[in-house]
Regions:
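Membrane-interface "cap" regions at the ends of multi-pass membrane proteins
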Residues: 1-30, 59-64, 68-96, 273-277
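Membrane-embedded translocation segments of transport machinery
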Residues: 2-13, 180, 184-328
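Inter-helical loop and helix-membrane interface segments of multi-pass membrane transporters/permeases
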Residues: 3-7, 35-39, 69, 74-97, ...
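Extracellular loop-to-transmembrane helix junctions
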Residues: 7, 36-64, 155-156
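Transmembrane helix-boundary motif of multi-pass solute transporters/channels
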Residues: 14-51, 229, 263-266, 281-283, ...
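Hydrophobic alpha-helical transmembrane segments of multi-pass small-molecule transporters/permeases
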Residues: 15-22, 48-53, 65, 95-106, ...
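Hydrophobic core segments of alpha-helical transmembrane domains in multi-pass membrane transport
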Residues: 48-57, 98-124, 159-172, 188-202, ...
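Alpha-helical transmembrane segments and their lipid-water interface positions
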Residues: 59-63, 71, 75, 113, ...
């Protein structure tokens, strides 16, 4: 009987990009800017960095070590990994929470993925000529125009089915030919497109309202300069540092953005070799995520939103929402 050859990561670069891709997402580009605005602007970075150093990085290394250890016994999910470490029956039942966490994340991330695909397609055909068009398109996409509580959009379901099928196909390709291959392409493209969007957003010139500029470069839908958004986001309010809720929010953001306690890091790390360096590789993946969050995420959503909605329209919206609705 021939033994099945165990899959491994083909390269360290692929592993880092896959781990970063596991972490980079809504938390970076939508949740982080909203949390920063709500919790002191630029001053939010102080508890944020403290939480990253004291909680984020150590816990990432713990999860990497746990995953690698469990992988030596052939376990690639949290129940098996916990069972190999604890040696008591109840440990594997605690690991079930890791499975449920990933199931819940996948259930709503597929919807977000399908919405993003639909928005990209509509953007290519020039469907967002006005800010109001974006809201109407979202209502059409989720079926809320019907006026029913349990509205269903056929097009929304079609995009969802396509994204679900695409994800299943990638996973069926395995570790190196599926996840790692896509990560090597997708992560560089994500960073490139995010950088382009950030630069393009900062170049918006208002063509309407009291700040309108008479220029061919002016955007007739923009009413403010995007740099006002940067100032709004990063002007520090140090008084907020005395509020315990700000520190809790910073820790929560670190847990959310690094995917700590969700079981996915355990799974990825279980395919490491026994002598692989988890300290350097884990830190590299974490800092890649932080670059996407603080540098890129902090330069996209708020400046662009301020350019089209103004500070007065943004302030109330961002303080009453997490940033998801504003993003779409």
């Amino acid at each position: 009987m021939t033994a099945v050859k165990k899959e491994r990561w083909a390269s360290r670069v692929g592993l880092v990009l896959a781990m970063a891709g596991n972490a980079v997402g809504l938390g970076n580009f939508l949740r982080f800017p909203a949390q920063a605005v709500k919790n002191g602007g630029g001053a939010f970075l102080i508890p944020y960095i403290v939480a990253l150093i004291l909680l984020g990085l150590p816990l990432i290394w713990v999860e990497w070590a746990m995953g690698r250890y469990g992988g030596q016994f052939g376990h690639h999910s949290t129940p098996g990994i916990f069972d190999s470490i604890g040696k008591r029956p109840y440990w594997k039942y605690l690991g079930v929470f890791g499975l449920w966490a990933n199931l819940m994340i996948a259930s709503y991330y597929l919807y977000i993925e399908s919405w993003t695909l639909a928005y990209a397609g509509n953007s290519l055909i020039g469907g967002f000529s006005t800010p109001e068009a974006s809201g109407k398109f979202f209502e059409w996409l989720i079926g809320s125009q019907s006026g029913h509580v349990f509205a269903v959009s056929p097009w929304g379901l079609l995009f969802f089915a396509f994204c679900a099928g695409l994800n299943i196909f990638i996973l069926s390709r395995g570790l190196a030919k599926g996840i790692e291959f896509i990560a090597k392409i997708g992560m560089p493209l994500l960073i490139l497109f995010a950088a382009i969007l950030a630069v393009r957003g900062l170049m918006i010139v208002p063509g309407a309202g009291p700040q309108a500029v008479d220029s061919s470069w002016a955007d007739k839908q923009a009413i403010a300069w995007p740099t006002e958004g940067l100032a709004f986001l990063w002007t520090p309010n140090f008084d907020t540092l005395w509020n315990p809720k700000v520190w809790i929010a910073a820790a929560g953001q670190i847990f959310f953005t690094l995917s700590i306690g969700m079981g996915s890091i355990h799974c990825y790390a279980s395919y490491l070799r026994e002598n692989d360096d988890i300290t350097l590789t884990g830190a590299t993946a974490a800092w890649t995520n932080e670059f996407c969050e603080v540098i890129l995420g902090g330069t996209i959503l708020i400046p662009i939103a301020v350019a089209y909605y103004g500070l007065s329209g943004l302030d109330e919206t961002i303080r009453n929402n997490s940033g998801l609705g504003l993003g779409f």
